[in-house]
Amino acid sequence: MDTEGFGELLQQAEQLAAETEGISELPHVERNLQEIQQAGERLCSRTLTRTSQETADVKASVLLGSRGLDISHISQRLESLSAATTFEPLEPVKDTDIQGFLKNEKDNALLSAIEESRKRTFGMAEEYHRESMLVEWEQVKQRILHTLLASGEDALDFTQESEPSYISDVGPPGRSSLDNIEMAYARQIYIYNEKIVNGHLQPNLVDLCASVAELDDKSISDMWTMVKQMTDVLLTPATDALKNRSSVEVRMEFVRQALAYLEQSYKNYTLVTVFGNLHQAQLGGVPGTYQLVRSFLNIKLPAPLPGLQDGEVEGHPVWALIYYCMRCGDLLAASQVVNRAQHQLGEFKTWFQEYMNSKDRRLSPATENKLRLHYRRALRNNTDPYKRAVYCIIGRCDVTDNQSEVADKTEDYLWLKLNQVCFDDDGTSSPQDRLTLSQFQKQLLEDYGESHFTVNQQPFLYFQVLFLTAQFEAAIAFLFRMERLRCHAVHVALVLFELKLLLKSSGQSAQLLSHEPGDPPCMRRLNFVRLLMLYTRKFESTDPREALQYFYFLRDEKDSQGENMFLRCVSELVIESREFDMILGKLENDGSRKPGVIDKFTSDTKPIINKVASVAENKGLFEEAAKLYDLAKNADKVLELMNKLLSPVVPQISAPQSNKERLKNMALSIAERYRAQGISANKFVDSTFYLLLDLITFFDEYHSGHIDRAFDIIERLKLVPLNQESVEERVAAFRNFSDEIRHNLSEVLLATMNILFTQFKRLKGTSPSSSSRPQRVIEDRDSQLRSQACTLITFAGMIPYRTSGDTNARLVQMEVLMN
């Protein structure tokens, strides 16, 4: 049987093959075993895929069917959904179809409004995002700029170089971040501000700061002497610093003050030298500069130098005596030498008398030209360096010659060049006979620069060079870069700022030292606000009182947004240090405010406190912000923030020292005080606050197991309906509740349903024989509880608020258990 079947099958196969070969014009292809296997596997996998899909559909139907879902019904509903009515274009209508035309116009208007609203919403979102990014980027830029103390390449120079100590060692470690010198400066700033705040005459800040130098070394003392000398100039009142600093009169005064300082310093140096070598100096005669210089030359020039001309006076070269008398700032003593040697000096006596008697130490143009002509013809290559130097000073000529044989020290070079500086342009001077202050400033700051003066070994020398040439901002910025000298630089800047001599940057994003368009070429500006904030950053967290004293100098400064810098710095200081009570004051139990440190600086503290509170609120410090708004008597903001704080903790279980317990006590204290003092806020915010407090009481009773008391509270609050007649009313009232109340609705519903369920179980657990109430009363109560549970389910389904699926499931479950 089987053999016949296989034989028949073979016969049919051969017949089929023969027919195929007969009708096909294509060449015959024979598959090997491997190809046959691959083809079979492909057919098998195709069959399995179809089978597995059917199996998956069956499994899905079984799974969803066990949960009461009909998968075929769901598929039909999904297939029946159509987006044609929403997204397909409107069908064209005939011109005479008025109804169709109106319908299309209405639909077009709706679609246009939706599209316009969508575009506007996206545009607003983009704009808000862009503004937020710009604000954040501005803050990042400020932080980056504040970390860079200097401009240019120096800001990125991280090489470690040893610095000599110019201040006393830091005292024993303590709470303060200030060392003894910085603390001494801070005390002087406190004294200065106290006088200003109390309306007294403005004290001399230079003298106050200079008194700190007594605790330090001679370099600091000399620095403050120089600052005092250079700032003792007469300024035009009611003009800005740039106009004052640019005026010829003030610039001439700066040069005069610098010369006076250099001359007095050199005279002190000669005194020290002479009294240190009394035997060699042979000091005697009438006390005065002439005898001092004569004795000084006994030490400096013990033997006559070759090339000196025009004889001697009392054994010393004439021109050396004249030069050193002038170097000490005593023209009368120099005139005494000139008179003694007048026969050897020719016309020089006449020229010197005119120079000495002129107001600005300046010869008349005719005399000056005559002297310069004589210098070029006879003295340019003279072998007496002192004679050449004196002629160059009096005639202000040959400014390219540095007179290095005589002016071998930096101070001597400065004195010589400042004597040659001219301010009037008569047009007759050649370039080699003309040196302006701007040219000299540029030469020192840009051409020579820091590398020429070995600033790491002698920082005060370069500071002196810049300061004496009226480049105050560059001098301060240079000194500020050195950690050990930073405090001195800051207080020099404060002195200049108070005297209206400091050129400040117009924007806070500028570098510490910058040049602004429109300023004279050699004018630099200092970012004073940034300088002060960088300095106070070191100690503002540990010494907020001292930092506040420095911030008071910024009371008239504005930032790029027009915000008062004092307010801004105080707010950042309070947030950073968390010294709210000490700085801003404290609220007593009776509602009165205990003054803080800020009260010394202003009688109206509300703007400052409100500003700090606003910053705290923006940083998410709602609890601190609420306390600050309370301090500023801003009841609306207090309750608004308290509502935000209370809402998340309302349903939590109270525990000692918990977050909820702390906030609850704070809220109760505010509520008691507001009610006692009759303080009220916005009605909506006010009602939300007291409702949240009532809900906290409700949940406390509920968690404590006092379900009857909790039920009485929720019944009095009328937040949820407990009978079918009040459902509509409660749903309508729910629309008026704030989000802080709505967010707690799920927990309120669950707690209320739990209370009803507990009462129901308690009622069911009471046997008729043991109960003192009649059976009828028990049945009525049973019916009432079921009705109330049903009412809660109805209310939960009707309110326009999406509760969680878990909440709905639990509510339904308990309601079902009660039925």
Swiss-Prot record:
Protein name (record): Nuclear pore complex protein Nup93
Q: What does this protein do?
A: Plays a role in the nuclear pore complex (NPC) assembly and/or maintenance. May anchor nucleoporins, but not NUP153 and TPR, to the NPC. During renal development, regulates podocyte migration and proliferation through SMAD4 signaling.
Q: List the disulfide bonds.
A: none
Query: Where does the record say this protein resides?
Result: Nucleus membrane; Nucleus, Nuclear pore complex; Nucleus envelope
GO MF term set:
structural constituent of nuclear pore
Where does this protein have coiled-coil stretches? Answer: none
Please give the subunit comment from the record. Answer: Part of the nuclear pore complex (NPC). Component of the p62 complex, a complex composed of NUP62 and NUP54. Forms a complex with NUP35, NUP155, NUP205 and lamin B; the interaction with NUP35 is direct. Does not interact with TPR. Interacts with SMAD4 and IPO7; translocates SMAD4 to the nucleus through the NPC upon BMP7 stimulation resulting in activation of SMAD4 signaling.
Gene it is expressed from: NUP93
Q: What is the lineage of its organism?
A: Eukaryota, Metazoa, Chordata, Craniata, Vertebrata
What's any one GO cellular component for it?
nuclear pore
